[in-house]
């Protein structure tokens, strides 16, 4: 579904280089130390950064040079980027038409995703009138209403309290499973990764240093566990 072949980004003339394959419907966590290149990897996939070399394939098509607006990808950031002067209904509608002129089918899609996110009663409110969790639900709805096959999450729930964060992770995981979306999620928490992603990759020094089962990483038995400060539970 998603394949990166030696995708290279030059950071202060030092190369970050990624080779990765992710299957359709797979949920993968991206972990690693601060500054390792996790967000860079997502931005290369989304098209916000242009690689110096390499190839990026999505569903077998070459999207290495495709602009972000035309890539079959949606991305959600920690900063939800909602427009403060637009209400919830309009912010979601932007995912369907930047001009907010929606036909009947598009309006039904907008309303359906609002119901699924549990925000249908908030449609007339402005972002400033919402809680942090509600704003992230709106931002997630705007991503999902675009119906792209790849969803990228760059720590969008890290500012939420633990209970709400777990609720949002479960919601995302369920929706991705239901729609067979391919999910890549950057996180600093291996515990969060274990809730949503059976597979993890660890990025270090601009490379994929390890990839495998999240449970193995969490147990401390993986070679990359030490990079994340995880100690083996075996005495």
From Swiss-Prot:
Protein localization: Cell inner membrane
Molecular function GO terms recorded: ABC-type thiamine transporter activity; ATP binding; ATP hydrolysis activity
Annotated ABC transporter domain residues: 2-230
Keywords for this protein: ATP-binding, Cell inner membrane, Cell membrane, Membrane, Nucleotide-binding, Translocase, Transport
Class of this enzyme: translocase
Pfam families, A to Z: ABC_tran (PF00005)
Alphabetical list of InterPro entries matching this protein: AAA+_ATPase, ABC_SmlMolc_Importer, ABC_transporter-like_ATP-bd, ABC_transporter-like_CS, P-loop_NTPase, Thiamine_ABC_ThiQ
Catalysis performed (reactions): thiamine(out) + ATP + H2O = thiamine(in) + ADP + phosphate + H(+)
Entry superkingdom: Bacteria
Listed name of the protein: Thiamine import ATP-binding protein ThiQ
């Amino acid at each position: 579904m998603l394949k990166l072949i030696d995708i290279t980004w030059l950071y202060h003339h030092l190369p970050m280089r990624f080779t990765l394959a992710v299957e359709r419907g797979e949920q993968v966590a991206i972990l690693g130390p601060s500054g390792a290149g996790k967000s860079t990897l997502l931005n290369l996939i989304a098209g916000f950064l242009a690689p110096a070399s390499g190839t990026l394939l999505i569903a077998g098509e070459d999207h290495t040079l495709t602009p972000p607006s035309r890539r079959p990808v949606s991305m959600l950031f920690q900063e939800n980027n909602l427009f403060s002067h637009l209400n919830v209904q309009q912010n979601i509608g932007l995912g369907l038409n930047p001009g907010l002129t929606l036909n009947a089918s598009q309006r039904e899609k907008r309303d359906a995703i609002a119901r699924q996110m549990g925000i249908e009663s908030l449609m007339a409110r402005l972002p400033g009138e919402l809680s942090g969790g509600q704003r992230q639900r709106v931002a997630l709805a705007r991503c999902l209403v675009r119906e792209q096959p790849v969803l990228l999450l760059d720590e969008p729930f890290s500012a939420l309290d633990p209970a709400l964060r777990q609720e949002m992770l479960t919601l995302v995981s369920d929706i991705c499973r239901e729609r067979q979306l391919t999910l890549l999620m950057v996180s600093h928490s291996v515990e969060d990764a274990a809730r949503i992603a059976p597979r993890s990759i660890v990025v270090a020094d601009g490379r994929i240093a390890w990839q495998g089962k999240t449970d193995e990483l969490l147990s401390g038995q993986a070679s990359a566990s030490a990079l994340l400060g995880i100690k083996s539970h075996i005495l």
